[in-house]
From Swiss-Prot:
Pfam families: SecY
Principal location listed in the UniProt entry: membrane
Biological processes annotated in GO: protein transport by the Sec complex; SRP-dependent cotranslational protein targeting to membrane, translocation
Functional note: The central subunit of the protein translocation channel SecYEG. Consists of two halves formed by TMs 1-5 and 6-10. These two domains form a lateral gate at the front which open onto the bilayer between TMs 2 and 7, and are clamped together by SecE at the back. The channel is closed by both a pore ring composed of hydrophobic SecY resides and a short helix (helix 2A) on the extracellular side of the membrane which forms a plug. The plug probably moves laterally to allow the channel to open. The ring and the pore may move independently.
Cellular localization per UniProt: Cell membrane
Provenance organism: Staphylococcus aureus (strain NCTC 8325 / PS 47)
InterPro entries for the chain: SecY, SecY/SEC61-alpha, SecY_CS, SecY_dom_sf
Residues spanning the membrane: 18-38, 68-88, 117-137, 147-167, 179-199, 217-237, 269-289, 308-328, 368-388, 389-409
MF (Gene Ontology): protein transmembrane transporter activity; signal sequence binding
Protein name: Protein translocase subunit SecY
Membrane topology: Multi-pass membrane protein
Similarity section: Belongs to the SecY/SEC61-alpha family.
HAMAP family: SecY
């Protein structure tokens, strides 16, 4: 592990990408401490608890929401917009489906629409959030209670989201890994210690016999270890489909090529968890504009993973998004065509259409196992808060840890691939 990190910094180009990414994250972190104009940050000094959606925004935004900073909306509107756009591409909007098949040009068009939708959502949600928080804090948040003040705050928060989207693009282009994922990763890491401290304080408050509190702490540590091991297993597990070659191959060529087709048990990674959590924010937005309406509150309660209905919906969403994104990441038809062109085949399966059907069947089975495993791992922290009386930050913290592990694994793989590529080029140049 240490040697791997050393290798990252030995390669100049990779080292520069790491430093660039860190510089962008420093800018992100500084922004989480700059309050939006016209607000009183001291209004949050005496928090009265928060809901799951609020905790999610705060966690993904690196604590920016509870400071009501310029990055208070974070990157969540972009995630929500991405979900909507992915769904609309499924022949719901023919033009989007057409763009999705146009390669790089089509992807650029879809990305632009996603950004416009994200900025629109950020503006709508920021207005509602300003009203909700000001009411929640009994008018102590907004200094000047005027329409112009609310509009100014909404514009600044929307600009903050737009800047974070741009920041993510810069990291993707010039830094390490996927920029949006890296920003979420950094935001979660910066709030995770506070969640653990809150848990420690809650566990020992009012406890004459501290043995029960220490038992809770031990239980949390064991749970975190099991969650980490389980997450790594489900994210890294691979099914190897054997491959044979129709043409004669020399021993040398066979030795240089993989004789199997690797399919991940969970090809979607942690994206389904991020999407499922962000999806809950859509119905909860109604409470921002209709805080006193009973029907809006009922919808919001159903969209809370802590409620019985919300927990079932959360599990179903994770499973559905896992299937959906697995087939976005893995294209059985393209795989079958590539195997046929290379003169290779799966033993006992005809090349072409039969191979496509076989890969699809295997992917369905693997994704079923992966989605159930992912749902179980995601639901455990929620059950812990529900039945052990733990603070809600642990619920978000458990899900966040899963996201952190997934992003860390993908980023490490990206770095290793870049180092290997540089070493290969260096070897070829000598």
């Amino acid at each position: 592990m240490i040697q791997t990190l050393v290798n990252f910094f030995r390669t100049k180009e990779v080292r520069n990408k790491i430093f660039f990414t860190l510089a962008m994250l420093v800018i992100f972190k500084i922004g989480t401490y700059i309050p939006a104009p016209g607000v009183n940050p001291a209004a949050f000094d005496n928090p009265q608890g928060s809901q799951g959606a609020t905790e999610l925004l705060n966690t993904f935004g690196g604590g920016a929401l509870k400071r009501f900073s310029i990055f208070a909306m974070g990157i969540v509107p972009y995630i929500t917009a991405s979900i909507v756009m992915q769904l609309l591409q499924m022949d719901i909007v023919p033009k989007f489906s057409e763009w999705a098949k146009q390669g790089e040009v089509g992807r650029r068009k879809l990305n632009n629409v996603t950004r416009y939708l994200a900025i629109s959502l950020a503006f709508i949600q920021s207005i509602g959030m300003a009203f909700q928080f000001n009411n929640y804090l009994k008018g102590a948040l907004i200094i000047n209670q005027s329409i112009m003040s609310y509009l100014l705050i909404a514009l600044v928060l929307t600009a903050g989201t737009a800047f974070l989207i741009w920041l993510g693009d810069q990291i993707t282009q010039f830094g390490v890994g996927n920029g949006i994922s890296i920003i979420i990763f950094a935001g979660i890491l910066s709030t995770l210690p506070a969640s653990l401290i809150q848990f420690g304080q809650t566990a020992f408050v009012g406890q004459e016999d501290t043995s029960l509190a220490w038992l809770k702490v031990l239980g949390l540590l064991v749970s975190l270890i099991l969650l980490t091991v389980g997450a790594i297993y489900v994210l890294e597990a691979v099914r190897k489909i054997p491959i044979q070659y129709a043409k004669k191959q020399t021993a040398q060529r066979l030795g240089s090529q993989a004789t199997y087709l690797p399919l991940k048990v969970n090809s979607a990674g942690v994206i389904p968890v991020i999407f499922a959590m962000a999806f809950f924010l859509l119905p909860r937005t109604l409470t921002l504009f209709y805080p006193d309406k009973e029907w809006a509150q009922n919808i919001a309660n159903a969209a809370n993973p802590s409620s019985n209905v919300g927990m079932v919906v959360y599990i179903v969403l994770i499973i559905l998004f896992t299937y959906f994104y697995a087939f976005v990441q893995v294209n059985p038809e393209k795989m079958a065509d590539n195997l046929k062109k290379q003169g290779s085949y799966v033993p006992g399966i005809r090349p072409g259409e039969q191979t496509k059907k076989y890969i699809t069947k295997v992917l369905y089975r693997l994704t079923f196992v992966g989605s159930i495993f992912l749902a179980v791992i995601s639901i455990l922290p929620i059950l812990a808060t529900k039945f052990m009386g733990l603070p809600q930050s642990i619920q978000i913290g458990g899900t966040s840890l899963l996201i952190v592990i997934g992003v860390a694994i993908e980023t490490m793989k990206s770095l290793e691939a870049q180092v290997s590529q540089k070493e290969y080029k260096g070897f070829g140049g000598r």
